[in-house]
């Protein structure tokens, strides 16, 4: 009688140890597939900022033409020039944008 009680208690402890890590796993959100160019860029911006929601609640933060082209250049690793470049300043290739580290959203 005591052996079966000890074995059932050990079985319950083993089951709790196996199951406990999985109760904290959050299901991945399925975001809609971006259809337009500015939705795609907004999703990339959300990835670089480290936010989880790519679509803003109020659409007052849309990217303009300059911001979208600068963002696309930055993602491709191309240099972004503002105005005319002085001849003494060389174009530095290979300067790629380092994205933010993956945050642990708890």
From Swiss-Prot:
Function: FMRFamide-like neuropeptides. Involved in mediating arousal from the sleep-like state called lethargus, which occurs during molting between larval and adult stages, in part by regulating touch sensitivity, and working in concert with neuropeptide pdf-1. Involved in neural modulation of systemic mitochondrial unfolded protein response.
Entry annotated with the keyword Cell inner membrane: no
Domain of life: Eukaryota
Basic and acidic residues bias: start-end ranges: 82-92
Protein name as catalogued: FMRFamide-like neuropeptides 2
Signal peptide: 1-27
GO BP, one annotated term: signal transduction
Residue ranges, annotated region (Disordered): 82-106
